[in-house]
């Protein structure tokens, strides 16, 4: 693995990224990782996808959003709009070959938004999206999984202070800002739906407390296209990071990449 590099993203913020596997010059379909809320590019699933890129000599790219990992910026300044803009920038500027976009949790929402924007504004770049893998996709999370779930007391705190420290079983509390919630409302997908020409695979744990299966089903139902499937993993939690679950993620991404290369039908 090469060392961490930095790209000057939108607004001049330096975004940390890693290139894995081969270069784009081999012409093979590669991978593009989009991580979750408060996650970084060195997480278990990101590392598993990076290892797959190296093992199969395919290009892989992963990066940290602003306020995440090794990138510049404060987490509490971040919004869906900014992280989406950064994702688009990295896809266009740092990848050249076809890619399978693999998005986890919030990264699943960003993957769908990325495809939506490129299909509308840059069809040439959109054609390089050869498939999308959504892991516990948290589309519309600022509304459906945050604001709608908050008690009146939490909502009052947000409106008065601009931030709510949401307890997390994964570590320190998650700061949820009113700015994030208000901005997220601009990017809601589930009610309007989204048509995608590329294959889409949704992988969802049946015991996920953060993005419940019912929400993943809403995502599934909101998407239309020629090849969309959803796999429910018995007993799987939000992380989906056991050895078997990581193998499923890898196999799913590789199958789509091989199909894009014409290796499998």
Can you say where each PLM-predicted feature lies in the sequence?
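N-terminal cap/lid segment of alpha/beta-hydrolase-fold proteins
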Residues: 1-24
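Short beta-strand element of the alpha/beta-hydrolase
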Residues: 27-36
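The serine-hydrolase catalytic nucleophile loop
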Residues: 37-50, 214
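Alpha/beta-hydrolase active-site loop signature
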Residues: 38, 65-69, 139, 237
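Conserved alpha/beta-hydrolase
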Residues: 48-72
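Catalytic nucleophile-loop/oxyanion-hole region of alpha/beta-hydrolase
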Residues: 68-95
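Primarily recognizes the serine-hydrolase "nucleophile elbow" in alpha/beta-hydrolase
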Residues: 90-153
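The alpha/beta-hydrolase serine catalytic core
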Residues: 125-233, 237-265
């Amino acid at each position: 693995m090469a060392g961490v590099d930095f790209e000057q993203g939108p607004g001049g913020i330096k975004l940390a990224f890693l290139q894995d596997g081969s270069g784009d010059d081999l012409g093979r379909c590669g991978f593009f990782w989009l991580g979750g809320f408060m996650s970084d590019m060195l997480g278990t699933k990101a590392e598993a996808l990076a290892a797959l890129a190296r093992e199969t000599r395919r290009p892989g790219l992963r990066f940290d959003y602003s306020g995440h990992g090794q990138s510049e910026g404060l987490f509490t300044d971040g919004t869906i709009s900014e992280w989406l803009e950064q994702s688009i920038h990295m896809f266009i500027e740092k990848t050249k070959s076809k890619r399978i976009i693999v998005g986890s949790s919030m990264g699943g929402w960003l993957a769908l938004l990325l495809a939506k924007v490129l299909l509308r504004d840059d069809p040439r770049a959109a054609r390089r999206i050869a498939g999308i893998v959504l892991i516990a996709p948290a589309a519309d999370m600022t509304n459906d999984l945050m604001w709608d779930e908050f008690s009146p007391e939490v909502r009052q705190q947000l409106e008065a202070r601009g931030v709510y420290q949401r307890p997390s079983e994964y570590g320190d509390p998650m700061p949820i800002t009113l700015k994030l919630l208000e901005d997220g409302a601009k990017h809601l997908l589930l009610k309007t739906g989204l048509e995608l020409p590329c294959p889409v695979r949704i992988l969802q744990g049946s015991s996920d407390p953060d993005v419940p299966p019912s929400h993943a089903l809403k995502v599934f139902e909101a998407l239309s296209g020629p090849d969309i499937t959803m796999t429910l993993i018995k007993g799987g939690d939000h992380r989906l990071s056991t050895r078997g679950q990581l193998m499923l993620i890898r196999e799913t991404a590789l199958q789509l990449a091989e199909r894009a290369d014409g290796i499998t039908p």
